[in-house]
Amino acid sequence: LECHRRGSFISDGKITCSAKKTFCCKMYEKIFGIYWYGCAKTYTEKNTWNVYSKCCTTNLCNT
């Protein structure tokens, strides 16, 4: 699985996930306006007052 990656100290691009990480995720930290993209081992989706996150089994949801 190849996911887009982005973080506060990581440049935009793509990363190949390890075999144990089967989800591409994106997370938006609403207070500071920081986006993070990458691979994840478990599925986590939430939308709270300070964090929005979404994961899927392709890289379509973390672009």
Swiss-Prot record:
Tell me which UniProt keywords the record has, alphabetically.
Disulfide bond, Secreted, Toxin
Q: Describe the PTM.
A: Contains 4 disulfide bonds.
Any one Gene Ontology MF annotation carried by this entry is:
toxin activity
Q: Where in the cell is it found?
A: Secreted
- This protein's major location comes to secreted
Expression by tissue, per the entry, reads: Expressed by the venom gland.
GO CC terms of this entry? extracellular region
According to its UniProt entry, the function of this protein is described as: Activates bacterial pH-gated potassium channel KcsA by binding to its extracellular domain, probably at a site different from channel inhibitors. Increases both mean open time and open probability of KscA.
Tell me its family: Belongs to the three-finger toxin family. Ancestral subfamily. Orphan group XIX sub-subfamily.
Q: What name appears for this protein in its UniProt entry?
A: Toxin Tx7335
Question: Source taxonomy lineage?
Answer: Eukaryota, Metazoa, Chordata, Craniata, Vertebrata
